[in-house]
Amino acid sequence: MKRVTGVFLTLLRFSQFASSVLVMSLLAYAIHAYGNRGNKKTNFTLATGVISVFYLIALGILCLALPTLIYIGMYFCAELIVCMLWLAAFVVLAKAQGERSCSNTNADGLYYNPYSGQYTADSHRRACNSSQAAIAFSGLCFVLFLISVILLGINVLTPIRKRYQTQGMWRSGASMGTKLHRWSGLALSEPFEETAAYDNTNVRTGDVEAGAGDNAAYTSEPNGDARYATNDPNGQYHTTTTNTRYTTTTADPKTRYTTNDRNPGSANVANSAVDQHAYSTDESGDRSYQEKVTEGAHSGAMSGSTAEPNRNVNQMP
């Protein structure tokens, strides 16, 4: 399919070039046959043909030698200008050469010379027919360039604008990682890769820290039904997270700690299996600390920290 598209675009450019050359050739022959230098209207069409041929030759060289030199903003404007020139040339030439038929004569049997604006005895039949044919080919040039403008907008301008917005209008193909079709310049030979939109419809979310925890796991979790738990190789503790409250139970049933973590900056660490510690908070908000040592002051190691700097410490006998 891409090969068929490339052949079609190449044939389109070749048709534009051939039609432009035909318009120039037909008008040049007509002007020479009439023995005149032409008029402003005819010369305008002739100049349009010259501009078109030069543009197509320059474009072909650039597409072959520098296909990454895109600058779609300038390229699209140039293509559109040539198209509008052919529209104006078609209208002007049809007005100058198409008002009268080549076989029409006046009352004296004289033929009208469109270049001099006078009636002569010479019909200049072949020159007149060449001028009429130039009108048809100038209209064909306009249609062909109109098609190329549309294709350029669809195949090149639109993808670049979708990916790079307005900044892509004035960027080279090398900076965007693409290049033009070598034989036509009407498509990207290396189109941009389409990026699939992110779909999170099957992802369940839950704010565990805010108390809205559920069994849903993130997509990267191998087991979607598993809750997160701490894996302790010695089997000494198991941690469960529920509504920002943390309960830790050691393997020794004699030592248990329960911490209501109201301040994330606090931490409590205990390493003695014989010390018993209790933390409590009364309704007024003041904290009290009680410590009971069952086997002497030096029977175990204990370290604790709290975020309350003004706590009351009472040691039980």
From Swiss-Prot:
Cytoplasmic side: 1-13, 71, 155-317
Composition skew (Polar residues), residue ranges: 256-282, 302-317
Extracellular topological domain residue ranges: 35-49, 93-133
Protein's UniProt keywords contain Glycoprotein: yes
Sequence ranges of Low complexity compositional bias: 239-250
One Pfam family this sequence matches: MARVEL
Keyword set includes Membrane: yes
Record's compositionally biased regions (Basic and acidic residues): 284-295
One CC-aspect GO term: cytoplasm
Membrane-topology annotation of the record: Multi-pass membrane protein
Protein name in UniProt: Uncharacterized membrane protein YDL218W
